[in-house]
Amino acid sequence: MIQAAKYIGAGLATIGVSGAGVGIGLIFSNLISGTSRNPSVRPHLFSMAILGFALTEATGLFCLMLAFLIIYAA
């Protein structure tokens, strides 16, 4: 019974990973849109997009780490 609850909790914790995937897609789609509108600001937009990517990916990895902790922690 406890093992089943761990698997359910880990599955729910991985929902954040899908949110991170959507967030990364939005970041880079807006980067492409902004670069096509004004190519001269590409370096600034790219650095901001990489920062947003890193923060979004960190959130997704945190959710994945939490899922592994739920499953394998004693």
UniProtKB/Swiss-Prot annotation:
BP GO annotations: proton motive force-driven ATP synthesis; proton motive force-driven mitochondrial ATP synthesis
Membrane topology classification: Multi-pass membrane protein
Site (Reversibly protonated during proton transport): E57
Principal subcellular localization: mitochondrion
GO cellular component: matrix side of mitochondrial inner membrane; proton-transporting ATP synthase complex; proton-transporting two-sector ATPase complex, proton-transporting domain
InterPro entries in the cross-refs: ATP_synth_F0_csu, ATP_synth_F0_csu_DDCD_BS, ATP_synth_F0_csu_sf, ATPase_proteolipid_c-like_dom, F/V-ATP_Csub_sf
Domain of life: Eukaryota
Subcellular location: Mitochondrion membrane
GO molecular function: lipid binding; proton transmembrane transporter activity
Transmembrane region(s): 8-28, 50-70
Pfam family, one: ATP-synt_C
Keywords, comma-separated and alphabetical: CF(0), Hydrogen ion transport, Ion transport, Lipid-binding, Membrane, Mitochondrion, Transmembrane, Transmembrane helix, Transport
Subunit structure: F-type ATPases have 2 components, CF(1) - the catalytic core - and CF(0) - the membrane proton channel. CF(1) has five subunits: alpha(3), beta(3), gamma(1), delta(1), epsilon(1). CF(0) has three main subunits: a, b and c.
Its biological purpose: Mitochondrial membrane ATP synthase (F(1)F(0) ATP synthase or Complex V) produces ATP from ADP in the presence of a proton gradient across the membrane which is generated by electron transport complexes of the respiratory chain. F-type ATPases consist of two structural domains, F(1) - containing the extramembraneous catalytic core and F(0) - containing the membrane proton channel, linked together by a central stalk and a peripheral stalk. During catalysis, ATP synthesis in the catalytic domain of F(1) is coupled via a rotary mechanism of the central stalk subunits to proton translocation.
Family: Belongs to the ATPase C chain family.
Protein's recorded name: ATP synthase subunit 9, mitochondrial
Organism lineage: Eukaryota, Fungi, Dikarya, Ascomycota, Taphrinomycotina
Gene: atp9
